[in-house]
């Protein structure tokens, strides 16, 4: 085969993916869709440029336009999140966490994080960035009923362990974490308080969910492509939480510690997204939470076992469903079936699942942020719940449901809460 044919195949698969994705109901909680303006930035000549260090203090020449964009980004991010510092250089949420662990921790230091089954991210784990730094990883006591950290037991743990770092936030995140309650206790023992906002950054930007930096967090790490609807990347936001030497260690850990060049085309996309969120973020975040609640309620009415009923099911973009009663393989059975019907989400461990069940966990994790951005509202959430019922409860042929999903999704092809299309109009 001629090498040009490989190029043609790659372009073909990209085109097919984009066509397929535009006609599916994407409910992956860790994904979103970027606006045409952000796409323009990501596809720009910034992708060819290299920059190391701070704006106007680079180790490379030719950065004058890149510097202007990054300085705009620092201004917008600090305004959006009311932080003293904003570092746009991390290239992912994991990269941001890695920098924090390396900058603030030493091998042997103790860190408290969520357990994987309770929603902790892999970068927090002994086998992830925390463990690679040599940190001694402990996990928060968790209350399955409230689907949250057990505050009383956590207070006791902090005082007994005297950790160097405590981490709030995670990947399974329907309810705010008790930052306000536990941050003062952590600071009593000299711990740094870190909040991993990867999943909820867009909600925080829009004034929903919680406000970690006002509730006691020193540092907020995040990815920029979930509820914050930018290109894949990361960010670190923080207050003047320590002396200059400690803050310099964190900054040094970012560069030259865990990255050199910081993917300038993605950086530019983050900056435009921050501007979009300053303009539209409040409306977007509010609708995300409304849609998540509407979907949870509709799924419960259809007969699904939705987690968190006593607390209104969710306060974030996520809806958690226990499907273990429907099939022995739980989410490992449900997610592929739904994919056949054009409904894309992921299987997920629930707090009572052992890690050995990772491929056949009890749960499904659902996120509504992308479907919200293409203009869907509460009524559409009811339709999505019914599609899921047809596949998983009624055992209807997924291929038949796929046809209905295709035509349903066809009506939602614009990216709202953006300068390109503004706000969606509710009929």
From Swiss-Prot:
Its GO CC terms are: cytoplasm
Task: List, in alphabetical order, the GO biological process terms annotated in this UniProt record.
Answer: glycine biosynthetic process from serine; tetrahydrofolate interconversion
**What are this entry's molecular-function GO terms?**
glycine hydroxymethyltransferase activity; pyridoxal phosphate binding
The residues the record assigns to binding (6S)-5,6,7,8-tetrahydrofolate are: 120-122
**InterPro entries to which the protein is assigned, alphabetical:** PyrdxlP-dep_Trfase, PyrdxlP-dep_Trfase_major, PyrdxlP-dep_Trfase_small, Ser_HO-MeTrfase, Ser_HO-MeTrfase-like, Ser_HO-MeTrfase_PLP_BS, SHMT-like_dom
Per UniProt, subcellular location reads as: Cytoplasm
In terms of Pfam families, this protein maps to: SHMT (PF00464)
Keywords of the record = Amino-acid biosynthesis, Cytoplasm, One-carbon metabolism, Pyridoxal phosphate, Transferase
Q: Where does the record locate the signal sequence feature? A: none
- Report the enzyme's class at the first EC level: transferase
Q: Where is this site: Plays an important role in substrate specificity?
A: 225
What is the E.C. number? 2.1.2.-
Q: Which residues carry this modification: N6-(pyridoxal phosphate)lysine?
A: 226
What's the main place this protein lives?
Answer: cytoplasm
What cofactors are annotated for this protein? pyridoxal 5'-phosphate
Name the pathway.
Amino-acid biosynthesis; glycine biosynthesis; glycine from L-serine: step 1/1
Q: Which domain of life is it from?
A: Archaea
Which purpose does this protein serve, as stated in its record?
Catalyzes the reversible interconversion of serine and glycine with a modified folate serving as the one-carbon carrier. Also exhibits a pteridine-independent aldolase activity toward beta-hydroxyamino acids, producing glycine and aldehydes, via a retro-aldol mechanism.
Q: Which family does it belong to?
A: Belongs to the SHMT family.
- Subunit record text: Homodimer.
Q: What is this protein called?
A: Serine hydroxymethyltransferase
Q: Which organism is it from?
A: Pyrococcus abyssi (strain GE5 / Orsay)
The taxonomy runs: Archaea, Methanobacteriati, Methanobacteriota, Thermococci, Thermococcales
């Amino acid at each position: 085969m001629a090498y040009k044919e490989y190029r043609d195949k790659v372009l073909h698969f990209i085109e097919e993916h984009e066509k397929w994705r535009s006609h599916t109901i994407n409910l992956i909680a860790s994904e979103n869709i970027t606006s045409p303006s952000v796409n323009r930035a990501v596809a720009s000549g910034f992708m060819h440029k290299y920059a190391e260090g701070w704006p106007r203090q680079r180790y490379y020449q030719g950065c004058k336009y890149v510097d202007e964009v990054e300085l705009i980004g620092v201004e917008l991010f600090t305004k959006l999140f009311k932080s003293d510092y904003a570092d746009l250089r991390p290239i992912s949420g994991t990269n941001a966490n890695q920098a924090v662990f390396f900058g603030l921790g030493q091998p042997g230091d103790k860190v408290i994080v969520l357990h994987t089954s309770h929603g902790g991210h892999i970068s927090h784990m002994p086998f992830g960035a925390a463990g690679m730094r040599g940190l001694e990883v402990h996990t928060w006591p968790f209350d399955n009923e409230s689907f949250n950290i057990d505050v009383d037991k956590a207070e006791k743990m902090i005082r007994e362990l005297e950790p160097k770092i405590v981490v709030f936030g995670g990947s399974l995140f329907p309810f705010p974490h008790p930052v306000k309650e536990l941050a003062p206790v952590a600071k009593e023992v000299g711990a740094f308080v870190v909040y991993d906002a990867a999943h909820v950054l867009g909600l925080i930007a829009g004034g929903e969910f919680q406000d970690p930096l006002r509730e006691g967090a020193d540092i907020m790490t995040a990815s920029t492509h979930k509820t914050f609807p930018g290109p894949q990347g990361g960010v670190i936001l923080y207050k003047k939480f320590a002396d200059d030497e400690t803050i310099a260690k964190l900054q040094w850990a970012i560069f030259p510690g865990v990255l050199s060049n910081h993917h300038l085309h993605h950086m530019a996309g983050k900056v435009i997204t921050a501007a979009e969120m300053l303009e539209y973020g409040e409306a977007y975040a509010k609708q995300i939470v409304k849609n998540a609640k509407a979907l949870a309620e509709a799924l419960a009415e259809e007969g699904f076992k939705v987690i968190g009923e006593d607390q209104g099911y969710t306060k974030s973009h996520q809806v958690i469903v226990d499907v273990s009663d429907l099939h022995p393989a739980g989410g490992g059975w449900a997610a592929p079936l739904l994919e056949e019907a054009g409904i894309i989400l992921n299987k997920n461990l629930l707090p009572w699942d052992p890690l050995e069940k990772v491929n056949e966990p009890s749960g499904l994790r659902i996120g509504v942020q992308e479907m919200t951005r293409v203009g869907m509202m509460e009524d559409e959430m009811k339709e999505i719940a019914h599609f899921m019922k047809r596949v998983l409860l009624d055992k209807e042929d997924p291929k038949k449901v796929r046809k209905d999903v295709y035509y349903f999704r066809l009506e939602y092809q614009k990216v709202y809460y953006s300068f390109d299309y503004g706000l969606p109009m509710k009929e």
